[in-house]
Each structure stands twice: as structure tokens, then as C-alpha cells.
Amino acid sequence: MPKRNDIKTILVIGSGPIIIGQAAEFDYAGTQACLALKEEGYRVILVNSNPATIMTDKEIADKVYIEPLTHDFIARIIRKEQPDALLPTLGGQTGLNMAIQLHESGVLQDNNVQLLGTELTSIQQAEDREMFRTLMNYLNVPVPESDIVNTVEQAFKFKEQVGYPLIVRPAFTMGGTGGGICHNDEELHEIVSNGLHYSPATQCLLEKSIAGFKEIEYEVMRDKNDNAIVVCNMENIDPVGIHTGDSIVVAPSQTLSDVEYQMLRDVSLKVIRALGIEGGCNVQLALDPHSFDYYIIEVNPRVSRSSALASKATGYPIAKLAAKIAVGLTLDEMLNPITGTSYATFEPTLDYVISKIPRFPFDKFEKGERELGTQMKATGEVMAIGRTYEESLLKAIRSLEYGVHHLGLPNGESFDLDYIKERISHQDDERLFFIGEAIRRGTTLEEIHNMTQIDYFFLHKFQNIIDIEHQLKEHQGDLEYLKYAKDYGFSDKTIAHRFNMTEEEVYQLRMENDIKPVYKMVDTCAAEFESSTPYYYGTYETENESIITDKEKILVLGSGPIRIGQGVEFDYATVHAVWAIQKAGYEAIIVNNNPETVSTDFSISDKLYFEPLTEEDVMNIINLEKPKGVVVQFGGQTAINLADKLAKHGVKILGTSLENLNRAEDRKEFEALLRKINVPQPQGKTATSPEEALANAAEIGYPVVVRPSYVLGGRAMEIVDNDKELENYMTQAVKASPEHPVLVDRYLTGKEIEVDAICDGETVIIPGIMEHIERAGVHSGDSIAVYPPQTLTEDELTTLEDYTIKLAKGLNIIGLINIQFVIAHDGVYVLEVNPRSSRTVPFLSKITDIPMAQLAMRAIIGEKLTDMGYQEGVQPYAEGVFVKAPVFSFNKLKNVDITLGPEMKSTGEVMGKDTTLEKALFKGLTGSGVEVKDHGTVLMTVSDKDKEEVVKLAQRLNEVGYKILATSGTANKLAEYDIPAEVVGKIGGENDLLTRIQNGDVQIVINTMTKGKEVERDGFQIRRTTVENGIPCLTSLDTANALTNVIESMTFTMRQM
């Protein structure tokens, strides 16, 4: 069937900011889809609120709108652009929910916009739990015993019939938001009321728990002619009960018999045919390990996290083909881009094993609730490819960057066996490593199986890994055993530990005896057809399939899994760097291990190596490819941390030299440079022990800010006010980075300013200066950034420009540099310098039209900025005002305090742009999920030091008609100024504030941190309650002030004459 000619313009809705449950996989899917539609000749209009993505680059669509993903804003774009059609299935749950709202409000009908791809009725049938269950009953496909509830009372009625445990699944949410497993009445009450709150339809499915069944997924495609294929089937190692995004996944499935595989395949195809899916779809099934009984769990009628994984696992570009199916093309007329000869109707076959392991944020949130269930907690994931299951698992483990490189914990031998078993009996993010530890201690596989329900097949594989460890110990230095361990994915580091050698000695031993990996191609067809994809993985076999060309090569290190502090912004820079390398005539090679991102799409680079980002794995590739050099400044801290290790092997680091990278991080050298170029910084010292830190603080004066050197995202950074807090910190944090000392700095409260610049060794260009709304002390990734600065004087701007140029030249930067300044006591001070690409590069690149990562890469290759047409200094300002607002995923993480501070907590960001600061802020806040209302009720409870400042704020909110609730201390302060406030009780008292929040009486909460155990606990409870009830909670008065400005701009003030 030819494609549709009756439509010309297509609107694509993106997925918005990165949150837990909806990460970079939609940047990848959306980018592929937009390019595919343009390739077919359609005019593409994209709306997405996330500036950090490749998808929102001007080249990807004909028109790009970076606007909040709300009904009203998208409706305006539809009225303005008059698209013929809307494609909703590539923007995750956000895109789907938006399409449903636009349909129900009549906007699509009024503007004659058709929906492409899967029909709305089918989407609703898959997403609405009641309609889905009805269809399954009609098809005779078993679903777990379940009931749909709209109230907590109904949930208790169902519990009386079936008993515990129960699984709660809210409708129309993603990442299992609001859901969970209930074992008793208290949990049932809490989880169901939460779930009803988060479900746009106020509807939850309660089902009898089938925890312990195998969880199997099929990624399927179907077109309008009813051609349907399975692209990939996957098996979760964790049984049903853990969200698939938090499960360790293997592809293809390993423990299904052919009968089981075909049975579940037939069911998956039968269901998507009945639903009338057109495009990609993910089917999740539960299989009883002891019989042929199965249940269907759910169907995602859209491109999902699993489809990104399936695309990278097979090389089959699901999103690209789904977009083409949506405009009428069919599978039997589209070529598979990997082979270029077979059609898209051929089901991929794999001659390798894929392992995916989720990346959790608990290294950032040590107090977070680690137990895993049906609500997702991982921020990202890694994938690894091997010839055996053991090899792919161990490669995935060392890709995670937890400081773990094997099946065990660094301090594993220090735990006693009872504690280890206790940890295994609970499902959490470290269970896999504790299983390895238990097997080492001789625990039987039967006992582990009874505690975890993990299939014996996988437990035997774990046992095999431990057996090889013992063999290495018994045959130290034996080459046969070394080779054997390499076949099963062991790292040099692990072998060195067992051989009683250093990692370097094992590496040399391998080199001398020619024990090196070869690289195999990912070709979708197990080498049945000729294939030309430049997509490789390493394994220890004989035949190398990676053909080395004569062209000069540059190797770019990617940034690994998405985590807090290192998000999709670094992938954005990586992709742009690769494009610049290709334009300059070099061969561009990427090494990365994140299946969700654009950089690991095989069509981006000349060669993609899907490998762990470790010294050993990267050196193996360098030894084969012999590149001109390696680029580390676009891959975040992951890549920067490898620079030293690679340089020791004689590898050339391109761009800013290693010596200068270290100068920016080394305290004493950096201070010497600042003195030389005459740039001030807050007074500070370094400490290697608690005693030294206390002496430093006494000299500098409290408050001080303390942090380990060489970290990203403000990990383990804190502001402390006295000796006791400092001692506490030093005993906890010196762990954070033992080889590197702790920095103790005077904490200056003032305006924080962020600057990104590019330097070629001679000229420094500054695309933009950004001012933070929150005072210094809130991590830059969690602050609202404003461009251009709104409150700085000409003198301050000139000083910032001058200092930036001095710093870039003083550090001999070649490429990008990011600098944070504070303006305090009438002076500009430098807070920190990062000699690499930063979180704000995509944001500034979009605003100014200066392709920063590409210019930096060209400078690294040796081109001059003046030859590219740029003059030194700050570049001309773009028109309008732009804000970057952070987005948090606190509703997915229990027990995490949401107070903003020097440690980063946000998972993503949105951009707001308009003609005034207030309008841009309105969009930024709306896009980040803060509903800005022109009237309502605000609850204020602030620390003593903030009481004076909060008076002015209360006055302004009162004048625009906001009602004020306050705790007694704050209310008394307001009464002094005749500001009416209703007093609410402290926690546990009469008319207590938590009840008021839970009852929906409050629209905004302003709560600032008070030190001291009891009040800290209260404050923590207040903040968690607001998050769990979906109410904006502002922990910085600067953010509250900005919000008040927006409210004032939307309304009229009422003052008596």
C-alpha cells in the first residue's frame, strides 16, 4: 500500500522532561520518527518541553515548539499551525494522555486533525483497565482475578473476596506511578488512595498477586494490512511483582521451551490484532513456572522503554518503522535498514545474549526506600551484549558505574550470612550482588530459589561465575584459566584479584599472549543475510568482524546510563560532537552502553561499539582501531574519569590536556592559577581528616560548604553550620572519595551565575550568561536558570565576561568550559570550573542558535573560532526571555527529602520562553508540573532565619487574593504586620497541617529547612506529604518569590484606598 497523500503536515507530541519511568528512550524514538516522516516527504511539527534532547533540534522537524505539554498550549499550536494529523504514540504516556484530552475536548475535531497510527479507541482499550479486561475475556485470554475500583471502600470489598497480597495498578499512568503491592489493610488504604490521586481517570485495577510467575515481554509490530511480527522477546530475571523497568532483563528469553515460546507469541499477536494496533506495541505476560498456565498483565499501545531496548538488542528500528506504518506503509514494502536487502517482515534472530540492568539513584539518595515493587525507581539502564549469559551479565554489571565490577559487593566479605540472606529475601536494587555473595558462602541454589523465585537456569549461571572465581584462585597465573574466564566476561580487575596480581599485570599478560577480544556485528539475522551495520560488541572468540579502514579516526566516549547529575544533556553533546567529526572528514567512533539514547543508534556514528565504559574495555577498542585520539569532554564525569587511565597507556586525549583537566580539579593548583590571573574565590581549604576540617572551619568561619573533589551532580556536598555537623559529615563523606581530599569553603549567600564558554586556545566565545533564581547553595542543576540575566549591572556583566576569558585561557581550554560564579558582598567570586561539556549546553545552543558542542569539537580538531565567524567575548543576546526549570521524580522515591541544597536531585528539565520573564517562568513552572493558579490557599511554615523575608511574600500573595495558612511561629510574625493568616496545628495536633494538605485545602506549600532532629522530622513529613498529594512544595524563598511574580502578572492586586 502506498503512503497516504491526503495529509501533508503532521504534529508529533514529545514526552517532555526526563522523569523516572520516562527517560531518554523517547528522545531516541521521537528523533527517529520525525526523521522518518521527513524522509517520506511530510512536513513535521514537533512540540516538546525538553530542551536537553536531540529531538528538539531545529534539524529534526520542520518546526519545533519548545512549550509546556499541556492541553491549552498544544491546542494553541494546533490552531496556529493547522496540522492535518497528529501522531501521539511516540511521546510515551505523556503523548498518549495529551491526545486523549485533545480528542475529548473537541480540539482535534474542531480543527480537522486526524489521529495517526493506532486508533484512539484501541489506545483506550489497552489503557483503560476495565475495557482491557472485557476484551481479554472476549478473546479467552486469561487475566489475573481483578476488580476496577474508583474508591478506597471498593478496594476493601474486593480484598474481602480474594485476600492478600494484592497488586494495585492505576489507569493511564506510566512507570507504575501510584501503584504497589499490598500485604495488609494499612498498605491497601495508602496505595489505593495514592493510585486514585495519580490516575487521570481516578481508576485503579486491583488484581490478585501472581508474584513469583515468570515475567515475559514480547515487542511486536503490526501494520494496517494485518502483517504482524515479533521483533524481540525478553525475559525478566526477577519474577512478576517488580516493575519491568526495574528488573534485570535478558533477550532472547532463556528459560522458555519452544512450546511456551510459541504459545505466548501467538497470544501476543492475537491481542494486538484484536486491539487493532498499528505500529509498535509491548505485551507483558506472566507464565507459571510449573505449568502452561499464563496471564496477560498489560499491553502498552505505543513505543516504550522496552521497544528502545528491543531496537538496540536486535538492531531493528522500531520507532522509525512505526512512524512509517502510521502514514500507511506496510511491513512487506519497507526494507530492514540494517541488512538493506531483507524486508521488515523478517523477524530478527539473535546469535548473542543481551542483558539489561537498571541504574538506580540510591547512591544519591542513601535514605531512599530501596525495596522494589510495581512502581518504577530506576533513572536509567545499561545494556551489554555477549556470547554467553555470564559474559553479557558481567559486562552489564561493570557498565553501571556503582564502583562494582563483578557479581559481588566491594565489602562483601564483611557481611555475615544471616544479613546476606535477609537482604536476598527482599527485592531491592542490590539483591543480585548479595546472591553472588551467598553462593560464595556455600548457600544452596534451592534455598536462594525459595527466597527469590528466580529460575534455576539463572542461578546456575551465577554459580558458574563463582566456580570460575575459585578455579582462578587455584590456578594463579595459568593462561588456560585466564582465557576461560575471559570467555565468560570476567574483567582484568576481577582476574587480578584472584590471581593476586595488579590489573596492569593481567593486561600485560594478555597482550604478551595475544589474548584479545574480537568484535562481532549486530545484524538482526544471525549472519543469514549480508549486512553492513557498523554496530559491534566485543567477545573472546576467533573471527573479528570489525573491518578497520585507512581513514583517520576519532573516538568519542559516551556518558553511560542516565542518572541524577548526568542526564540526556551529555548524550546530546556526544551526538553533536560526532556530527562535527564526520563533517571534518574523520571517521567517528562511539563507545557507549546506554540502550535508551540517540548516540547508540547505529546510524549516528561511522562505528558504534556497545561496550562498558571502563579502562579495559575502551583500551581493547583503541588497540584495534588505533584512533588519532580520544575525546572525553562530552561524556560527563564518566568520560572525564577515564582520561587519566587512558593517558597512562599512551592514548592521546584530544582537547583540553589532561594536565589542565587536573589543574581545574586540584585545589592547590587551581588556587595558584586564580592568584596568578587575579580572579577571587570564596576562602577555602582542603582537609584529609576530621581534625584538619575542624581547624579549617575555625579559621574560615561558619557556615562552610564541604564536598569531595572530582564528583558530578554535587554528590555528598553539604552546607554545615557548626562543629558537630562538620564532624558528622567528615566521618560519613571521607568515604565518598578516599583518594581525594575534602574541600572546605566559606559559604557565600548571593546570586549564582552560570557561564558556558568555548575556547580554541586563542579566542574565547561566551554564547550566554545565565542567572539562577535560587541563591548560591542550591545545586545549579536544581535551580531555575534565566537567560539573559535580569538583575545584573553592566559592571557585573563585564566582570563575568573578563573572568571567564581569563579562566579559559589560564587553563588552556580547548573545547568547552562551564563556570559557576557567585555575586556577594559587591564582588564576583568563582565557585567552580568544569573543563567539559555541561548540563546547560543544549539549552544555550537552542536559544542562541550557536551549535556549541559542534564548535567545541571543531576547535578540538584544530579549527579557529575566528575562522568560523565568531568574535571573542559574550555573543549577541537572543530575543526574548528563556528559563530552564528543573523537574523532579520525588513521587516515585519514598523517604527522600525534597529540600533543595548543594546535592542535585532533579532528573530532568523543561524550557519556558516568552517575551517577559513572568511569561517565560509561567511556562517553565507549568511545564515542570507546578500548576500556577491566580487564587487559592498557600501554607507557610518557615525557619526563624526566613521569617523576616517571608513577610513581604505573604503581603503580596494576600493582595492578589491568596488565603494564607501558617504554623503558629510564622503566623505570629505575619500578625505583627497585620497580614491575616489562619493558624494550623503542628503535626499530630488539632487542625493539623498534614490533614489540611491531604484534604486538598492547600494549593502551594512554602517550607524552609530548620535544623534540629524533631523539627527536621516534622519538616520532612510536611514535604513528603505535599509530594504524595501532588502539591508544589517550595523549599527556597527565591523560587516562591518567582512564583509570586508570575501570579501577580496574571491577576490584579486589590488594595484599599
UniProtKB/Swiss-Prot annotation:
One of its GO terms (biological process) is glutamine metabolic process. GO terms for cellular component: cytoplasm. Binds 4 Mg(2+) or Mn(2+) ions per subunit. ATP 1 binds at residues 129, 169, 175-176, 208, 210, 215, 241-243, 284, 298. ATP 2 binds at residues 707, 746, 748, 752, 777-780, 820, 832. InterPro entries: ATP-grasp, ATP_grasp_subdomain_1, CarbamoylP_synth_lsu, CarbamoylP_synth_lsu_oligo, CarbamoylP_synth_lsu_oligo_sf, CbamoylP_synth_lsu-like_ATP-bd, CbamoylP_synth_lsu_CPSase_dom, MGS-like_dom. Mn(2+) 1 binds at residues 284, 298. Mg(2+) 1 binds at residues 284, 298. Mn(2+) 2 binds at residues 298, 300. Its EC number is 6.3.4.16, 6.3.5.5. Residues 1-401 are annotated as: Carboxyphosphate synthetic domain. It is an enzyme of class 6 (ligase). Keywords: Amino-acid biosynthesis, Arginine biosynthesis, ATP-binding, Ligase, Magnesium, Manganese, Metal-binding, Nucleotide-binding, Pyrimidine biosynthesis, Repeat. Pathway: Amino-acid biosynthesis; L-arginine biosynthesis; carbamoyl phosphate from bicarbonate: step 1/1; Pyrimidine metabolism; UMP biosynthesis via de novo pathway; (S)-dihydroorotate from bicarbonate: step 1/3. It catalyses: hydrogencarbonate + L-glutamine + 2 ATP + H2O = carbamoyl phosphate + L-glutamate + 2 ADP + phosphate + 2 H(+). Its cofactor is Mg(2+); Mn(2+). Mg(2+) 2 binds at residues 298, 300. Mn(2+) 4 binds at residues 832, 834. Belongs to the CarB family. Composed of two chains; the small (or glutamine) chain promotes the hydrolysis of glutamine to ammonia, which is used by the large (or ammonia) chain to synthesize carbamoyl phosphate. Tetramer of heterodimers (alpha,beta)4. The large subunit is composed of 2 ATP-grasp domains that are involved in binding the 2 ATP molecules needed for carbamoyl phosphate synthesis. The N-terminal ATP-grasp domain (referred to as the carboxyphosphate synthetic component) catalyzes the ATP-dependent phosphorylation of hydrogencarbonate to carboxyphosphate and the subsequent nucleophilic attack by ammonia to form a carbamate intermediate. This is Carbamoyl phosphate synthase large chain. It comes from Staphylococcus aureus (strain bovine RF122 / ET3-1). The gene is carB.
